[in-house]
Amino acid sequence: KASLSSDKINDLRINLIEEELNEFKEAILKKDLKEVADALTDILYVTYGAGHAFGINLDDCFEEVQKSNMSKLGDDGKPIYDEKGKVMKGPKYFKPDLTKFL
């Protein structure tokens, strides 16, 4: 069963993800694609580690969120964008139910 851990472990997981996110930001600013790839991979690695520490199967969660995101498409099967380029919720949108994986 999924659960949060001790404050020490929770803080560690937060710090690891923040550290990798900061490395990603630095790589973007430096326009260093190799370091961007490295940082993104490290973000995934520490995120999956956090999921494991909390007993959360992130593959199952990702699949559910992917299905939800695909439900945002319009009736024509194409994304609906706002003025900033963000995909909006379409008429068949459903909110992902992650509780079934906890």
Where are the regions a protein language model picked out?
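Flexible "arm" and connector segments at domain edges
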Residues: 1-40, 44-102
